[in-house]
Amino acid sequence: MFTYIDPSIRKRLEEQGKLFQIDGDGARVAAAHAVTRGPAISLLGPIPLPLKLGELELQVDWYACVRRTELGKLEEIADELRAQQGQALFATLASSMAVNSVLIVGDPERWQDPLVRVHSSCLTGDVFGSQRCECGPQLASALQKIREDEQGGMVIYMSGHEGRGIGLWAKAATYLLQDGGEDTYQANRSLGLPDDSRDFSDAGSLLKFFVRGQPFRLLTNNPKKVHDLEKMGITGITRVKHVTGVTDANRRYLSAKQGWGHKLSREDLDAQ
């Protein structure tokens, strides 16, 4: 049973230290205490997770992460459903909650300058292997680089960032507009949506908790991502170029990202 469905399981996991909370500053807080800075995040883990992605095999510790406000609301509704014998609605209830993930490689207690990837979810690229974007290769490459790095590091997988935050349904519509000649940002605007509506505040809190103020290297071509994290008070970020997965199918898409400010050179866009 999920922790928001069965309170006895929730209590047991809390006693084992496998279910806990952090505040917006990344400080661990007791479940009964009020959070003073930013939204609280509930974490489940660490959960040993052996991964195999193509030829890449590695062992990570997985943490499932969700905003405490979302979890709290679902727990209240779940209590009512349980009292009314409404178990059939639990699946619908669970589907409305965005759960992020943290994948840890190595021992965070020994990190001094870990390698980090904050990765936005992309069903078409990460799962289906679509070449309209470079998301799938970026995720696989990040995990391989982190595994091979002497420091180790982490991937923060942001589940609510599909289509730069507009969601899968709207993303599908932008693909049709792109096929009609618009670039990825023009397509968003045609739908009345922002170029990029992603919120990295939860990623910032998770970085504060796991990295603990140490300098770290961030795998990204997007200076805005660095800027957004720095606005949250995170310092010591070194941006590391992360170009991979360039194909004829996504070259125009990557060119639009270059025009929007991503650090991509002509040589990067010409690569195969």
Located regions from the model:
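Catalytic domains of riboflavin
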Residues: 1-272
